[in-house]
Structure formats: structure tokens, C-alpha cells
Amino acid sequence: MKLKVYTWIFLLLFSCQSIIAQEPATKVDLSLAKEIDHSIKSGLKWLYDQQEDDGSWNHYPAITALVLSAYLRAHPSVSESEPMIADGFAFLTACIKPNGSIYSEDMPNYNTSICLIAFKDANNPAYDQVIKNAEDYLMGLQIDESTDITTDSLYYGGVGYGGDQRPDLSNLQWAIEAMAVDERKAYDPEKNMSEDEKNRIIGKKLFYDKALVFLARCQNLQNVNPESYSQNDGGFMYEPGSSKAGGTNSYASMTYAGLKSMIYARVDKDDPRVQSAYNWISSNYAIETTPLMGLQGLYYYYQTMAKAMNAFGIESVDSPDGTSHPWRHDLANQLLKMQTAEGFWVNENGRWWENNPVLVTAYTLLALEEIAGLPESTTVKKRNVIFK
């Protein structure tokens, strides 16, 4: 592990200073906000000691990027000027390929998408070209007419892990999030945009429109997905005609991912596709486990849920039986009780790398930061939310 120097981050994490402001503009009560503050601080402390000598976490780009985003979103004074953050970005920069992708050995789309989010969170103009190149790479991965695939293909509009691997909703939702993170800056009507910026906006719009075609084929909603495999409960499956929950069953992680992706792709919240996804969520609301999947991918589920609910902009999920579930309160308390004494989180079920405490702790911190934030902050350039 790296020898640490006494920086602002060190002083913040190892002092009595609070991360969350005394009177936070938060959607949770002050008592819970203080518990979240302590939890985030403990998690960041633990991650502080896990950084490798090469600046990475676990020597892996996507995991490193998730950790960097967790730090950058926790406090506005955390910046790339901090040595540990700079070292992390130096590792990511070393993973940049000539075609704009950001990865080491495998899964170029997955890694590039998550690294792109971190580069945007850095809010550093020095990375503008890195961001543009990564966006161009992701848009180039989309399956469409340029790959001799027509709109009647089940895979049209999708994105997979990269290369020749077939598309799936999980990879597509990361790519959409990576594109959408700084949307508000891009769509500022008062800004005099260059032709390049205008063309980039047009390119993103086309990317979203094609992605929505693929999303429809992952949704169990027959009026938008008339394929024979489609059920009609409004939820989402992993890929057209196949679900990790068996058959073509809708399940929670992908339904939250689908909801989030539609909103990021600028589908109106009153659109039947969005409302049908929410109706599935309201009928299958769960916190302790992920519906139909148990503990498999549980922390992925938590961070996707927090992002989706923030994007959807509601404070309570109303179940068909009339029960109102304050999702921020429910999810925060669940995550708080799952934290270890050392400050990290880990899943006893190791599927999808969730026996890796660095990955799972990064997921959880991002979820807690969403919980503590404002719904409308979801696509802001640098989402420091309430931490001041």
C-alpha cells in the first residue's frame, strides 16, 4: 500500500470534522444525516488505506473510478489536487487507449463508462479531450446501422461489455449514465455553443434514441415490446429474451436500471414506459434482499436503486396495499447496519465480484451520497450534493 502524506483528505477523515454540513439541505432528518456522515467517513477512511502503489484500487480501472467518484462526491474540497486522488487519475490516464477507451485487459465498455463518470466528476478542464474521446468510443460501440444491424434486430441500440459480446441492459445503463452525468452543462440555453458542442449534443440524442429501442426490448411491457418472450408486468430483464432471474422474468436491479436509463435518456416521467417500471417497483419494493435474486448483486442493486429513485424524484414508494415506503430512510438504515466495524461493506454472496470489499464499499458510499442528496442533483456536472 502507498505511504500516505498528511493532506486535506487525511485531516478530514482522521479528525472530528463533519463531512455533512450542520444544517444540510438534505431529504433525511438531521439525526439520520449525522449517522450517514459517520458511515461515509468510516468507509472513506477504510478505502484510504486500500490504495495500491500504482495509485489504483485493486489494480482495476472501473473499481478505481468508482472509489474516486465516491471521494469526489463526498465533499467539495476533495479535488484532484489531493495526492491520492491525483494518483488514482494517473492510473486511469495510463489505461487510456488511442481509440478513447479506458481499460486494462478486459471489458472495455464497462471500464470506459465508469472511468468516464469519474473523469467528469473531477471537473477538470484538462480532461475535456479525454471525456470527448471516451464518449465517442462509447457511441461507436452502439449496435446500429453502422454495424449492419437494422432496427428490427433484438440487439439494435444496445451496448455490451465491448468487442463482439452481445449487448445487455447492465452495460447500457452504465454507458447512458456516463453520457448523462454532465447533461445540464451541455444543455445550458444561455451558453453560446461551438459547432462541435452542438454536434455532440445531436450525437448524444441519437445515442439515447437508439438506446431506447433496446430498452424497450428488455422491458416486459407488451405495448412497446410485442416480442413473444415479453410478459406484461412493466419490469425489465437483463437482455432481450433472457433474465438473470430465470426465463424472461423481470427483476429489481434491471428494473431500477431501466427506470434510471429512461429518465437519463430524457423520457418523460409520465410516459407509460416509465410509469410501468415504477409500478413494478412499487409492487416489489424490498430492502433486505433484491427481489427474485436474494443476495446476488445486492450492493449493485442498492446503488442502482438510489440513483434511480433520485432521478425519478420521489421520496416515498407507494405499494399497492397502501403502504408508503420512505426509500431514503429505509435504504440508509439498511446500509448503516450492514457496515463492518472496520468501515467497509462486503457481500457474503460473491457473484458479480461482490465478495470484493473495495468494490462493494464504493457502491455503498455512492448509494449513501445519493440518499443524502437532492433528487435534482442527479445529472449535475459535479454532484457534491449536501456535503460542504
Region annotations inferred by a language model:
Residues 1-5:
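Positively charged n-region of N-terminal signal peptides that target proteins for export
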Residues 22-42, 53-84, 98-136, 141-333, ...:
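An alpha-helical repeat/solenoid feature that recognizes helix-turn-helix modules
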Residues 7-17:
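Bacterial N-terminal signal peptides
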Residues 85-95:
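Active-site-surrounding "flap" and adjacent substrate/cofactor-binding loops of secreted or lumenal enzymes
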Residues 44, 89, 385-387:
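Secreted/extracellular ectodomain signature
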Residues 6-8, 21, 385-386:
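Short amphipathic alpha-helical "recognition" segments used for binding
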